[in-house]
Amino acid sequence: MSNRTSVLLVAVAALAIRVSPVTAQAPSFEVTVDPATRSTPLTGRLIVVVSKTAQPEPRMIIAPQGPALFAIDLNQLRAGQPAIVDTKSALGYPVPLAQLPAGEYYAQALVDVYERVTRAADGKTLWLPMNDGTQQVMQIAEGNIYSDVQKIQVGKGGTVKLRITKTIPPTPRPQDTEWVKRVRIQSQKLTAFWGRPVYVYATVLLPRGYNDHTSVRYPTVYTFGHNIPFNFTPDSTRVRNIGQINPVTGVETGFDFYKAWVSDTFPRFLAVSFEQATPFFLDSYSVNSASNGPYGDAMVEEIIPSLEKQFRMIGKPYARLAEGASTGGWQTLALQLKYSDFFGGAWVLQPDPIDFRRYQLVDIYTDTNAFVMPNTQLTTTERPFRRTVEGQLTWSLRQMSLFEEALGTKVRSNYQLTGWEAIYGPLDAEGYPKPLWNKLTGTIDRSVANYMKENGYDLREYAQRNWATLGPKVAHKLHFFSGDMDDFYLNLAVYRFEDFLRSTPDGKRVPFTYGRPMKGHSWHAVTWAELVRQMGAHVRQHAPAGEDTKAWWY
């Protein structure tokens, strides 16, 4: 190949990169809800999912790396009335409908159904995807409706007709077992806030000998995840690689943890996980929130006291421990800081941003745009949202924001970025969460950033502001863990939290453990069994004089 030809091809390739392809004749979608499926007017988010494959069903693989989405809001759509999704009406991800490349696809319509709710706390009337407190994404949420999968051809224009005929049924709740008990607790505080019953679900893992040692009370670890604590399972047929440590996560299988849990001379704990979904996200983060309600107060004043009445828990601060990773890591630290006298220890693993000067890679107090960083006087570069442990960019923050906006307007995506806004942020004039940045332009709203700081959601800032009283209470209770190449750049805020603590007398001894090299978001420093052993030793070390710390270690 001649040099001249090479230069020409490079120039053509560069032009192709700069100019997005446009389908000459993009299709439109005419979506109708069968009156037999729903006869009443429908408000919600209609998403037409367009995939290159028929299986799994397109709706079941909705994700940032998944199929194309084309979405519109529905406002009291009458049964049988068609909704039009076209190049003018639809927000598209990852490309506009007009830029969907020609070819063969499989299309499916899904509606995230909204319910009209008047929030008792402020009297605001909202349209929201409600739930009963269990963790349900829109693809499988009870009451949402969808169509069959239909093969389509893109590039020839025309109208694709999709008919919604199916309703997602309730998901059966797991049954209690010998080891695992499930409890539903109504919160009066949250019920008063919403003006309707609100529940928190707890999954309680019993220690070996719980039914035999009837006079023993146990320390409790609250694991802020949504599954059975520590992935516990006595069924060896449900797991692979028994006896091996996962090279990525650093933890054992659920069956190997079960063997440790029931072994001799293992510290006997009760372990509890929670489901506390809100209309805006899969988890409340266990804090009081303008949008979600007083989940923090509910947790420490209602939910945990209720569990302590139902199970033989010691029920004293030294014997209440918190542990969590990612979402759960942020919750764990927030609970230990905001209810410092209630919990006796916090194991904070790869937490969501705990210093908002590193809200992932965004400084929400000084940056003006979340999507880009200046790299010269005249140009900018895209800000990443996720990377591999080798540093390869997988999604940009612009892509993630567009994805969430496609899932739901008015902070109703039920995904991560809008979930944070509903937890940390103020309300807009209508009563919906106020976005931290515009999801299409990236422009940061500094008033929202300042609200988050002033109301204590930037946990480093909150701790620093209150450290004179917090330090002596919590420094000996904190333990931090993070991989050096966290997929979502969460280690950067952990470094800044450590810098603050190292500047204080109380904080100098707080342990920070980092996974190196190339340890990502799911990394753990020790196995689950070893973590519980460390927790047992911590409880013994910090138990007040006169407390029996031998009865539960058998």
Put a short name on every predicted segment.
Residues A36, S51-Y554:
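Non-catalytic cap/lid and distal C-terminal segments of serine-dependent acyl enzymes
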Residues L15-V22:
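C-terminal segment of classical bacterial N-terminal signal peptides
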Residues V7-L8, V22, I354:
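Short amphipathic alpha-helical "recognition" segments used for binding
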Residues A24-Q55, R184-I185:
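Mature N-terminal segment immediately following signal peptide/propeptide cleavage
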Residues M1-S2, A24:
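Initiator methionine at the very start of the polypeptide chain
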Residues L9-V10, A24, P305:
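A periodicity- and composition-biased signal for non-globular, repetitive helical segments
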Residues S2-V10, R18, T125-T134:
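Sec-dependent signal peptide recognition
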Residues V12-A13, A525:
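Alpha-helical and His/Cys-centered functional microenvironments
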